[in-house]
Curated annotation (Swiss-Prot):
Enzyme class at the top of the EC tree: translocase
Gene Ontology MF terms in the entry: NADH dehydrogenase (ubiquinone) activity; NADH:ubiquinone reductase (non-electrogenic) activity; quinone binding
Pfam families assigned to the protein according to its UniProt record, in alphabetical order: Complex1_30kDa
Similarity annotation: Belongs to the complex I 30 kDa subunit family.
Subcellular location: Cell inner membrane
Role played: NDH-1 shuttles electrons from NADH, via FMN and iron-sulfur (Fe-S) centers, to quinones in the respiratory chain. The immediate electron acceptor for the enzyme in this species is believed to be ubiquinone. Couples the redox reaction to proton translocation (for every two electrons transferred, four hydrogen ions are translocated across the cytoplasmic membrane), and thus conserves the redox energy in a proton gradient.
Protein name: NADH-quinone oxidoreductase subunit C
Reactions the enzyme catalyzes: a quinone + NADH + 5 H(+)(in) = a quinol + NAD(+) + 4 H(+)(out)
Keyword vocabulary terms for this entry: Cell inner membrane, Cell membrane, Membrane, NAD, Quinone, Translocase, Transport, Ubiquinone
Domain of life assignment: Bacteria
CC annotations in GO: plasma membrane
HAMAP family: NDH1_NuoC (MF_01357)
Amino acid sequence: MAENNRAVVKLKERFANALLDCTEYRGEVTVTVKKENILEVLKCLRDDLRYNFLTDVTAVDYLGQDPRFMVVYHLMSIPNKDRIRVKAPLTEADCSIDSATALWNSADWVEREAYDMFGIDFKNHPNLVRILMTDDWVGHPLRKDYPLQGPDREPYKGRLS
């Protein structure tokens, strides 16, 4: 059960008002926190609970729901051989969250990818620019309201091979 997990117990003690949900599925614990508290929670997990490896940051688009977006952090404690998932909901009107690059350098490119694909604004990111799409690309291709056929664009005229 998630309630018996050491990390969940510690987070409930320190961030009772910031935690929105705690679940466990197939041994994987997920905590959902208010976006305003994301850096404090991630720092506690890193410094106090030894979740020393940020494996991924991504986003999910729940078009038609409020909140529309969920930013998802996958953390691993190498010393404790444990994983935890941390989620933070974002509304469509305020699609921004603090960058985790101050805690983990590995957040750099994955936050840029979430920005590029979903339009999530990672505040205080050192270089929040597109990483996969061209600089002139309009829109964010993994949003559920992005046109399936893609935007009308001129065919590529450069060398293909």
